């Protein structure tokens, strides 16, 4: 069974220690709820990942574990077969003992767009909301973060993350907790909070922004990346049914509308640092994710539109600072 005890120990004397009042019981319930289904099968695979400590790791320019020289061809083949049992791999890529996990998303491209605009992560405690299998968490560690906590309720993402961590070394201060943000108390503790690719999946985007604010210390930095449309501060797309074949897309605002929402939620120093139309080369079908991808979500006769006729995915990165909340918002 995947254990979270080392995380509990690490936060016991930190500014996250009050989380221990509720977190163990919440994670215990999550484990009980998932004792059937795929999780036990994936945990058995994790228990087979007994390999020597890597001769090198790189989290600065990539997520690389091992040079590829430590394992024999047979050992490498066995490891690849085990890692393939966690398919589909969506966020990456990862380089594990010479094995290239070519994920659906080139998450390294997103990181390259974001990293130059954020405050330095040196010695920061970081929260990554909707972290997937944890690719960006490793890059945050490589950028100097003191501790990185990711939350994502998916059992598969947790097991993919655990696979990489067991191969990289359990001592790294990177932790994935299978939670949704609505299960977090107001911690007011993180120096930087990332929410990338989450907002449009939330039924109430304003509530999501308030939940993100509640995790930041005053003066802490929010890094928000989400789908946007063109338009003024009144422009918001609400898909009638599906967007890019996704049935869980609720609100896609313009950059101007999103910045207004953030201002209303008592963020300050709000700025848009990047907009980017998602390229077919950034999200695509691969050998490690053989299902439909972006190409199948777009109009085959006009890739500037989704298959439903909406504008094709365009993403913006907004950075904002948590201000001291005004009393009206607190009481609101």
From Swiss-Prot:
Keywords: Transferase, tRNA processing
GO biological process: tRNA wobble uridine modification
InterPro entries to which the protein is assigned, alphabetical: CmoB, Mo5U34_MeTrfas-like, SAM-dependent_MTases_sf
Pfam families in alphabetical order: Methyltransf_9
Positions that bind carboxy-S-adenosyl-L-methionine: 91, 105, 110, 130, 152-154, 181-182, 196, 200, 315
Positions of disulphide bridges: none
Keyword Transit peptide assigned: no
EC identifiers of the protein: 2.5.1.-
UniProt enzyme class: transferase
Reactions catalysed: carboxy-S-adenosyl-L-methionine + 5-hydroxyuridine(34) in tRNA = 5-carboxymethoxyuridine(34) in tRNA + S-adenosyl-L-homocysteine + H(+)
A GO term for molecular function: methyltransferase activity
Assembly and interaction partners: Homotetramer.
Recorded family membership: Belongs to the class I-like SAM-binding methyltransferase superfamily. CmoB family.
Role description: Catalyzes carboxymethyl transfer from carboxy-S-adenosyl-L-methionine (Cx-SAM) to 5-hydroxyuridine (ho5U) to form 5-carboxymethoxyuridine (cmo5U) at position 34 in tRNAs.
Protein's UniProt name: tRNA U34 carboxymethyltransferase
Organism: Shewanella sp. (strain W3-18-1)
Species lineage: Bacteria, Pseudomonadati, Pseudomonadota, Gammaproteobacteria, Alteromonadales
Gene name in the database record: cmoB
């Amino acid at each position: 069974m995947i254990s979270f005890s080392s995380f509990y120990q690490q936060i016991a004397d930190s500014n996250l220690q009050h989380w221990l009042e509720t977190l163990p019981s919440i994670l215990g319930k999550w484990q009980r709820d998932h004792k059937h289904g795929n999780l036990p099968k994936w945990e058995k695979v994790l228990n087979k990942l007994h390999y020597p400590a890597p001769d090198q790791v790189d989290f600065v320019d990539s997520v690389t574990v091992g040079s590829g020289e430590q394992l024999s061809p047979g050992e490498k083949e066995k490891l690849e077969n085990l890692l393939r049992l966690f398919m589909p791999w969506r966020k990456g890529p990862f380089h594990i003992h010479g094995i290239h996990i070519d994920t659906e998303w080139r998450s390294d491209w997103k990181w390259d767009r974001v990293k130059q605009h954020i405050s330095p992560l040196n010695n920061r405690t970081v929260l990554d909301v909707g972290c997937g299998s944890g690719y960006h968490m490793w890059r945050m560690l490589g950028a100097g973060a003191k501790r990185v906590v990711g939350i994502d309720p998916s059992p598969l993402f947790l097991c993919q993350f655990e696979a990489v961590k067991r191969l990289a070394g359990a001592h790294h201060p990177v932790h994935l907790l299978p939670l949704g943000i609505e299960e977090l108390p107001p911690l007011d503790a993180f120096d930087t909070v990332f929410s990338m690719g989450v907002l449009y999946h939330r039924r109430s985007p304003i509530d999501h922004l308030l939940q993100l604010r509640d995790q930041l210390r005053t003066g802490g930095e929010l890094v928000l990346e989400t789908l946007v449309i063109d338009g003024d501060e009144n422009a918001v797309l609400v898909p009638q049914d599906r967007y890019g074949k996704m049935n869980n897309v609720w609100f896609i605002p313009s950059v101007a509308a999103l910045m207004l929402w953030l201002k209303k939620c008592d963020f300050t120093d709000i700025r848009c640092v990047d907009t980017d139309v998602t390229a077919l080369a950034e999200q695509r079908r691969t050998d490690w994710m053989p299902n439909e991808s972006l190409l199948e979500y777009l109009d085959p006769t006009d890739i500037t539109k989704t298959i439903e006729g909406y504008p094709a995915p365009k993403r913006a990165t907004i950075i904002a600072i948590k201000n001291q909340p005004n009393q009206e918002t607190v009481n609101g």
